[in-house]
UniProtKB/Swiss-Prot annotation:
Classification via InterPro entries: B3_DNA-bd, DNA-bd_pseudobarrel_sf, REM_fam
Gene3D superfamilies: DNA-binding pseudobarrel domain
Biological processes per GO annotation: megagametogenesis; pollen development
Spans traversing the lipid bilayer: none
Cited SUPFAM superfamilies: DNA-binding pseudobarrel domain
Organism: Arabidopsis thaliana (Mouse-ear cress)
Regions of compositional bias (Low complexity) in chain numbering: 105-116
Name the UniProt record assigns to this protein: B3 domain-containing protein REM3
DNA-binding region of this protein: 12-104, 154-250, 286-382
One GO MF term: DNA binding
Compositional bias (Acidic residues): 117-131
GO cellular component, as recorded: nucleus
Taxon lineage: Eukaryota, Viridiplantae, Streptophyta, Embryophyta, Tracheophyta
Length: 492
């Protein structure tokens, strides 16, 4: 396995390069990089990996300098091959961003105006022509720079009691320089996952040299229920005279945000939410089903492997089907260990019958997995799917009709019992469903009320905007009338 430790990149962030060619075990962090940037850190037992291909943050355990548990899952999810070359860039404390630099390529030539580091481009095979090797290196370098520039649109903002009290938060110097936000004084918009925007001021701290935003940071955090001690990922969707930052997904540390800085580490645990992701990640949130006769006969709905892999389904588990009216139908995902396939074993036939879905009809389900809750497959409209797949959408608007409350869903479920199967193998796979506790129902009711209030706030802001536009139009009409009167007087 090739070893290419590098001290710094064009962005002045430490990184190292590893080739997967001919490897027989998990990757090892180069000794030079480990000594310079990681040695001596307390509690160095695991790290975090991110990539442009997924919004997920992957936990990888460390056995000394060698990657251990979690690396195989990361490799499988990103379809890594033995001729890939990976760039590991240290973004924040123990969080590495992984970028592929191409196939069958042994080294990357890095150059900077300051001349921090410069390495030669050599091919693995000694018999190759020098000019061909340089051409390949330049192509791989351009691809690496393009992929790195796309990742520079993202930033992690830590929420602390201090920046809530001051009503401001600072960007990293690298993010500010990469996106031209240094020494600027303008308005900037923060957008949440529902498409609502808050206007803040972008300012520059002359003492620290950092760019920061202030004004409505506390209001944005409270409205979106962001918790102190957490890191949240934002994407720079629009730059220019008025930049726009959109909340992508959140990452919650194991310890407090302010304490992590003192301890010299940021232990981050993974959490999912709806985000901008790659096109493949967005598509794999949706499961499109064309109802066939053999599906009804077998009572099984097979799930494609990419859908299972991208949504973290690793074993048999309960799942809830939610129809277009918000009614929930308990189901169960079973697995075939021999074929390594997953399928829904029961419940979904009753779901189709109740929603009057006929053989030959096509419908789409959206996968939603909350923290510590049973995953759901929600009936999705075509308009919502098109909006999710649009690359420049400002965000997913909230539904106009509020979700049915938990009590209604629970009562409807009692009227729609699951159809039992005569197959003894399926009966063995079934597991008893646990009844919903009062606290779970209270959480659902609370979430329903929050969704209604959020929708009301959004509609209220839209009405206020339309009202201001109408008032401006009336003023223009009055001004035009005055001008017409003056012209008539002159003509008379």
């Amino acid at each position: 396995m090739a070893n290419h430790p590098l001290s710094s990149s064009r962005s002045n962030r430490p990184f190292f390069v590893r080739s997967l060619a001919g490897h027989t075990s998990n990757l090892i962090i180069p000794d030079e990089f480990f000594t310079a940037h990681l040695e001596g850190k307390t509690g160095l037992t695991k790290l975090k990996l991110t990539s442009d291909a997924s919004d997920r943050i992957w936990d990888v355990r460390l056995n000394g300098r060698r990657f251990a548990g979690g690396w195989d899952d990361f490799s499988a999810a990103h379809c890594l091959r033995d001729d890939d070359v990976l760039v590991f860039r240290l973004d924040v404390k123990m969080v590495f961003h992984v970028t592929p630099s191409g196939r069958s390529f042994s080294q990357i030539r890095t150059s900077s105006s300051s001349g921090d580091y410069d390495s030669d481009d050599d091919d693995d095979e000694a018999g190759d022509d020098d000019s061909d090797s340089k051409n390949i290196s330049l192509k791989k370098k351009s691809r690496f720079e393009a992929e790195s520039s796309s990742s520079e649109k993202y930033c992690l903002l830590g929420l602390t009691a201090s920046n809530l009290r001051l009503n401001r938060v600072s960007f990293t110097k690298h993010f500010s320089r990469a996106n031209g936000l240094t020494k600027r004084c303008c308005m900037i918009d923060l957008m949440n996952l529902s498409g609502e925007s808050w206007t803040l001021g972008l300012r520059h701290n002359k003492r620290t040299g950092q760019a920061f935003i202030r004004g409505r940071w506390r209001s944005f955090c409270h409205a979106n229920e962001l918790k102190p001690g957490s890191f949240y990922r934002f994407k720079l969707v629009r730059n220019g005279t008025r930049p726009l930052l959109q909340l992508c997904f959140k990452v919650i540390p194991q310890g407090n945000c302010s304490n992590s800085k003192a301890n010299g580490k940021a232990n981050v645990s993974e959490k999912y939410s709806r985000e901008d992701g790659s096109a493949s990640t967005k598509q794999n949130k949706f499961l499109t089903v064309t109802l066939k006769h053999y599906m009804i006969q077998s009572g099984q709905l097979r799930l494609r492997r990419s859908f299972v892999r991208e949504n973290g389904i690793k074993e048999a588990e309960e799942i809830i089907l939610v129809d277009k009216n918000g009614v929930e139908w308990p189901s169960y995902v079973s697995s075939s260990k021999q074929r390594r396939e997953f399928y829904m074993a029961h419940g979904w036939i009753r779901f189709c019958e109740a929603n009057k879905l006929k053989t030959g009809e096509t419908f789409t389900l959206e996968f939603v997995r909350g923290e510590g809750t049973t995953p759901m497959l929600k009936f999705c409209s075509e308009a919502k799917i098109e909006q999710e797949e649009a690359p420049e959408e400002r965000g997913t608007p909230l539904p106009k009709r509020a979700r049915v409350s938990a009590e209604v869903g629970h009562s409807r479920r009692t009227q729609a019992p699951n159809k039992s199967s005569d197959d003894p193998k399926i009966l063995q796979r079934k597991q008893p469903l646990q009844p919903c506790s009062f606290s779970d129902q209270a959480k659902k009711v609370k979430q329903s009320i929050v969704n209604i209030l959020t929708g009301i706030k959004r509609f209220r802001s839209e009405l206020e905007l339309k009202e201001r536009n109408l008032e401006a139009a009336l003023l223009e009409i009055d001004a035009l009338g005055d001008k017409v009167s003056e012209i008539n007087k002159i003509l008379k």
